[in-house]
Regions:
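Loop-to-transmembrane helix entry/capping segments in MFS-fold secondary transporters
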Residues: 86-87, 174-191
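Intracellular loop-helix junctions on the cytosolic face of multi-pass helical membrane proteins
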Residues: 1-75, 79-80, 84, 223-260
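Transmembrane alpha-helical segments of major facilitator superfamily
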Residues: 6, 91-100, 192, 232, ...
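Juxtamembrane helix-start elements in MFS-like secondary transporters
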Residues: 84-93, 145, 222-225
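C-terminal ends and interior cores of transmembrane alpha-helices
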Residues: 125-140
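Residue-level signature of mid-helix packing/kink "hotspots" within the transmembrane helices
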Residues: 97-105, 197
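Helix-to-loop junctions at the C-terminal end of transmembrane segments
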Residues: 102-118
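Hydrophobic core of transmembrane alpha-helices in multi-pass small-molecule transporters
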Residues: 61, 143-160, 166
Length: 260
């Protein structure tokens, strides 16, 4: 029903946005003989020895954990803090993901004008504003939260469009394209899964320790839920924005392969 239609619409919007994405130039890397290759275990660890990749990965991890926390706690926040119904929660999800997909062409235009890093920074700051607003919501303010879902979904578009492009650019300029790009992608995918694991594995026990249990109506417990759902991601997003600005934008020696 509603959810299937929303997923189909989101996939269609994402496909249309992908069609507008710029294609990176293809460069055929020379194939080395077996005698010229490093051992496989060294190839696996090679990305972590590269300062540009470590810097980008640090920003990606901090930002990813900040984004994963609301995703892990959204159902509890909507049900217990906002007193939202199941259809309203379904609508929140529809608005969030459709907004994220539809915002990607706009973010691509921002990238063309201001660059990848500054576009990502703008997305982070938009997300901080959304989370700060969400922290102040009270029970019954579902319309305001729907607006937040649209805006935070738009911020999600930057997370979908920019980090992967930065990684692809880094791989290309480091000379690993076609030779060792699998190692870079492997560490990147591991970081993605680590973001989700840390968000759920840390925040749920923390909420229980703070006195919140699903279905709780205690005002203090619900206030603490709002803090963890919204203010903790704000702090992490601001830290990620600082790292992005410090390591990738204003560094005296911009890491080759990251800054276009």
């Amino acid at each position: 029903g509603t959810m299937r239609g929303a997923c189909a619409l989101a996939l269609l919007a994402g496909w249309l946005a992908l069609g507008q994405a710029p294609r990176p130039p293809f460069s055929a890397a020379p194939q080395e003989g077996h005698e010229g290759r490093e051992p496989r275990y060294r190839q696996l660890w090679l990305p972590l020895t590269q300062a540009p990749f470590r810097r980008l990965l640090a920003v990606f991890l901090c930002n990813g954990i900040a984004s994963a926390i609301p995703a892990a706690l959204m159902l509890f926040f909507a049900q217990d803090r906002l007193q939202a119904t199941s259809p309203q929660i379904a609508l929140f999800l529809v608005l969030y993901f459709v907004s994220g997909a539809l915002s990607m062409p706009g973010w691509l235009r921002v990238v063309r004008r201001f660059g990848l890093e500054r576009a990502w920074l703008a997305g982070m700051l938009l997300a901080v504003a959304c989370f700060g607003w969400a922290a102040a919501l009270q029970g019954g303010q579902v319309a305001a939260f729907a607006v937040i879902c649209v805006l935070s979904g738009a911020a999600l578009g930057a997370d979908l469009a920019v980090p992967g492009a930065l990684l692809a650019l880094l791989i290309e300029r480091s000379g690993a394209q076609g030779t060792n790009d699998g190692a870079y992608l492997g560490w990147w995918n591991l970081a993605t899964k680590l973001n989700l694991a840390l968000a759920a594995g840390a925040t749920l026990p923390l909420l229980q320790w703070l006195g919140y249990l699903p279905g709780s109506q205690d005002p203090l417990a619900l206030q603490r839920l709002a803090w963890i759902y919204a203010l903790l991601p704000c702090a992490l997003k601001l830290m990620a924005a600082w790292l992005l600005h410090r390591l990738l934008i204003t560094s005296r020696n911009p890491p080759q392969g990251v800054t276009p």
